[in-house]
């Protein structure tokens, strides 16, 4: 749970967020100048995460894109991806420029918080706490995307997103040109203009340097523009709307698919409806069981969202120990453990993940003690070190919600 620097230093406080929500949130863009004493992520951290993200390219359904001169690279993409020997974004730029003089490039990575890792994610969550306390969490998701390179403008052109965006400038000079919604015809999320001609009437430029944060609401059209040189930025998108029916359908589908495994796929249908079956009997039974468990599944999903600050993809801490009855365990002082019961099931959620266990008073007392800041041990909770308590503590260790404490340190903390 430790960070090289205190993640709470990225909490801007209630006074800042009170003024921000009143003046800007969902209303108009702004630039937040140098809000942190230390950058939320260093250029070295971001470049190392870029290298780690290249592993995704080797998967079938990846969300990493590299473009050169505005064209997405496909077959030989690994030739141009960042490498450790590049050393930095500047080194990658020099390598591409040497091979392709005069060319520009862009690297895009979706859900980049996974590669940036646990410490970075804790900093972002602390940044969001004050905003969420005033406006609530986005019902769909929060996500960090990487935009990096020497590109002259956003490949997508002028467009709107369904998210409110905080753009953290990591390296270089970042410019986002924005227009209010009324500047262009209605018709969804519209992409234009072709060629080099871009309308500027009615636009505003958000210019940021390393350490600044650019903000624009989802209602604003926007496009990234070059101010010269390479730039690296992290866009934190907050996506506010989620479909209740869509969420339920996804949860039902996921649970049934897990149970069916390879039997979840059919290859063909009969030529005559006389031979048609709605689904194999095993599949129908799986659908029925998933439907019966829907209330628990929905509660777990929402608790995962809340405990994970709305991030759908969350990193894990690097160090996770074994559960021992003699050890003392203490909870994260920054982010609490959540508990809810649905019927006879207890749901525990922490750091964007959850577990469902049989409800018990002993389990509830353990979670309450941890959230009060009281270290706990299995030997002190129950004579036999109840298997469900072990499972709960193993889950909390896995998610980084608790850590072991020496007896002496724990006694000082009481």
Model-derived regions, located:
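Acidic, low-complexity/disordered tracts enriched in E/D and polar residues
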Residues: 290-370, 394, 405-414
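Long, charge-rich alpha-helical interaction segments
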Residues: 250-309
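Short amphipathic alpha-helical interaction segments
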Residues: 383-398
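Active-site region of the double-stranded beta-helix
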Residues: 2-23, 36-42, 47-210, 222-268, ...
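A residue-level signal for conserved active-site and pocket-lining positions in enzyme catalytic cores
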Residues: 32, 234, 396
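Short capping segments at the starts of secondary-structure elements
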Residues: 368-379, 402
């Amino acid at each position: 749970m430790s960070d090289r620097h205190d993640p709470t230093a990225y909490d801007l406080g209630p006074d800042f967020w009170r003024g921000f929500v009143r003046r800007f949130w969902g209303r108009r863009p702004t630039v937040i100048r140098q809000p942190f004493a230390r950058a939320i992520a260093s250029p070295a951290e971001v470049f190392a995460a870029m290298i780690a993200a290249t592993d995704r390219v080797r998967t079938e359904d990846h969300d990493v894109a590299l473009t050169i001169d505005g064209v997405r690279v496909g077959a030989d993409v690994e030739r141009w991806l960042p490498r450790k020997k590049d050393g930095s974004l500047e080194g990658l730029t020099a390598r591409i420029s040497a091979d392709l003089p005069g060319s520009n490039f862009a690297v895009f990575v979706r859900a980049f918080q996974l590669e940036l890792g646990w410490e970075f994610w804790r900093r972002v969550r602390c940044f969001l706490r004050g905003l969420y306390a005033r406006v609530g969490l986005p019902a769909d998701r929060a996500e960090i995307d990487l935009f990096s390179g020497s590109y002259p403008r956003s490949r997508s052109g002028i467009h709107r997103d369904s998210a409110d965006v905080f753009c953290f400038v990591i390296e270089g000079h970042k410019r986002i040109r924005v227009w209010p919604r009324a500047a262009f015809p209605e018709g969804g999320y519209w992409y234009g203009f072709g060629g080099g001609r871009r309308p500027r009437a009615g636009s505003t430029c958000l210019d940021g340097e390393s350490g600044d944060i650019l903000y624009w609401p989802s209602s604003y059209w926007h496009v990234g523009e070059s101010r010269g040189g390479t730039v690296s930025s992290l866009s934190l998108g907050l996506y506010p709307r989620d479909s209740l029916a869509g969420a339920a359908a996804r949860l039902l589908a996921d649970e049934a698919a897990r149970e069916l495994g390879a039997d979840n796929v059919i290859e063909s249908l009969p030529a005559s409806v006389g031979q048609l079956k709605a689904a194999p009997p095993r599949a129908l039974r799986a659908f029925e069981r998933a439907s019966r468990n829907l209330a628990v599944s929905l509660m777990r999903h929402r608790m995962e969202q809340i405990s994970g600050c709305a991030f759908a993809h969350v990193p894990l801490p690097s160090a996770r120990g074994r559960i021992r009855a003699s050890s003392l365990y203490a909870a994260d002082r920054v982010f609490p453990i959540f508990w809810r019961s649905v019927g006879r099931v207890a749901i525990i959620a922490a750091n964007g993940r959850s577990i469902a266990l049989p409800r018990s008073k002993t389990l509830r007392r353990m979670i309450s003690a941890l959230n009060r800041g009281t270290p706990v041990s299995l030997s002190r909770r129950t004579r036999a070190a109840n298997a469900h308590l072990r499972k709960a503590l193993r889950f909390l260790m896995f998610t980084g919600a608790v850590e072991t404490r020496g007896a002496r340190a724990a006694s000082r903390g009481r």
